[in-house]
Design a protein with these regions (language model features):
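Glycine-rich phosphate/diphosphate-binding loops that line cofactor/substrate pockets in enzymes
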Residues: 1, 86-92, 128-142, 162, ...
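Thiamine diphosphate
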Residues: 1-38, 44, 200, 206-218
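Glycine-rich beta-alpha junction loops
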Residues: 37-38, 100-106, 148-150, 176-177, ...
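Active-site-proximal loop->helix
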Residues: 38-61, 181-186
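Conserved thiamine diphosphate
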Residues: 50-92, 204-207, 240-243
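Conformationally flexible catalytic loops at phosphate/diphosphate-handling active centers
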Residues: 56, 78, 84-138, 263-270
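Phosphate/pyrophosphate-binding active-site segments
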Residues: 73-76, 96, 111-112, 229-304
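Glycine-rich, anion-gripping cofactor-binding loops and their flanking helix/strand elements
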Residues: 148-237
Length: 304
């Protein structure tokens, strides 16, 4: 589904900038319905209440934190504009802005069409899948890394099946923690770099081929590595792009790549997974006493 927020022009819209920027960074689909001045007010020569620098300042600010924007100033083109923006919101899993001028709120218009999914080049998908599998089969220590886009695009079950067929150990990123936790894959926890368990960290740091699905290459996900990570040695599928070294296949949905890979790998008996790292000895047993509260007490309360 999509999140929706309706706000007033200027003050209302600017109050949600931080939340919208977070949604953009974390690939959360969100529709912002924002008011804006009508044609008469926009050309009155007066500075309007809640106007920042110009009438278009709101639109320009949100253009930095949304994947598509539209101002519904024309009732004839509004249905197609709305349909385009909503499709981009779903296909890119990022926020979009729909500005509604005051004098257009009651304007009649045609029904909004439902656009078919954006087309992609199946030959490019097939070529990318072949190149990925060749790299995976040639690697000595491949590891699969899954991130938030796997959940956003609804491919968690298919990615789990891919991990089982490839018999790869799986890590999640910090932003993707909790993914595939109950899907029966060879899951080794969340990669936290120098802050994580050494055995878990070594799986990625020492891998000759990280296979990254839906991975956001951010500092919170990979910036805590003891050494600068060379993503050129990785296979990366995210933001409708598929990367193999210096090769980039544009406009390929994550789901299309996963399906193409599964078509090339027949189901097989599951091999013996590598041993999971030992469970950390988390602090437990909160004692109700008169000593000052500390961070360790909160950890014990949560673990209990």
């Amino acid at each position: 589904g999509l999140g929706v927020v309706a706000v007033t022009y200027g003050a209302g819209a600017l109050n949600v900038v931080n939340a919208v920027a977070s949604a953009y960074a974390e690939c959360s689909p969100l529709v912002i319905l924002a008011g804006c001045p009508g044609e008469v007010e926009a050309h009155s020569g007066l500075v309007l209440h809640h106007q920042v620098r110009s009438i278009d300042s709101q639109l320009r600010i949100f253009s930095e934190i949304t994947c598509d924007q539209v101002r519904l100033s024309n009732a004839d083109t509004a249905p197609e504009d709305i349909a385009r923006v909503l499709r981009n919101c779903r296909e890119y899993s990022q926020p979009v802005l729909i500005e509604i001028p005051r004098d257009m709120t009651l304007a009649p218009m045609r029904e909004v069409p439902v656009l078919a999914p954006r087309s992609f080049n199946q030959e490019a998908v097939n070529e990318a899948a072949d190149e990925w599998l060749a790299r995976i089969h040639a690697a000595k220590n491949p590891v699969m890394v899954v991130d938030v886009e796997v959940r956003r695009f609804g491919v968690e079950a298919r990615v789990a099946e891919l991990a089982r067929r490839l018999q790869l150990p799986v890590l999640t990123t910090f932003m993707g923690r909790g993914l595939l936790a109950e899907d029966g894959v060879d899951l080794h926890g969340t990669y936290l770099g120098v802050a994580g368990a050494p055995e878990t960290t070594a799986l990625l740091d020492e891998s000759d081929l990280p296979v990254m699905l839906g991975a956001i290459l951010s500092d919170s996900n990979f910036g805590v590595s003891a050494q600068r990570m060379d993503f050129r040695r990785a296979l990366i599928a995210a933001h409708r792009e598929v990367r193999v070294g210096h090769h980039v296949y544009h406009d390929i949905p994550l789901a299309a790549l996963v399906e193409a890979l599964l078509e090339r790998i027949p189901p097989q008996r599951t091999g013996t997974p590598r041993a999971l790292p030992p469970q950390p000895d988390y602090p437990r047993g909160l004692v109700a006493d008169d000593t000052p509260l500390c961070a360790g007490d909160l950890s014990r309360a949560l673990n209990d």
